[in-house]
Amino acid sequence: INIDNCKTIPFWFFQYKNILHELCSKHFDYICSYLIYHDCGKPFCLIIDDNGKRHFPNHAIISKNTFLQYSSNQFIANLIEKDMLCHITKPKDYLSLVYEPYIELLLCSALAELHSNASMFGGFASDSFKIKFKNLDKLGQRILDAKYNKNNSQGI
C-alpha cells in the first residue's frame, strides 16, 4: 500500500497494523456486533432543537443499556458505552485513554465511523471532516505511541 495515496487513513493505522490486526481478529465477532448495535439507543434519546437539528444526548450510555435489555454480553456493552471516547477526547488529553481497555478497537471504530459519516460532515474535502480526521489522527498516534513505542516523543 502506498501510504501517500491514503490521505484519510492515519499513519498510526499502518504503523501499528500488526497489533490492530491481531486484536481485531481475536475479537472479530464481538466487534461486528458492537458496530451494528453501538447506536441502538439513539431512538430513545432523540431531541430536535428549535432549528430542527437532531441531538442524541447520552446516546452511548442509553445504547449500552438498550443493548443489555437483549444481551448479557458485557464486553460488547462496554465497547458501546465507550464508543464516543475517541470522538470527544482532545489529542492533548490522550493520556486519559492510553490504558483504556481495548482502546485500539475504539480507535479503529472511530476511524470507520468518521469515514462512514463523511457525507454528513460535507464530504472528505470539507473542513469539518478534515478537523475531525486531524484530531483522530493525532489522538491515535499519541495513544499508540505511548502504549507501544518505548522511544516515543511523548515523554512517557
Which stretches of residues belong to each language-model region?
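Non-catalytic terminal/accessory segments
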Residues: 5-9
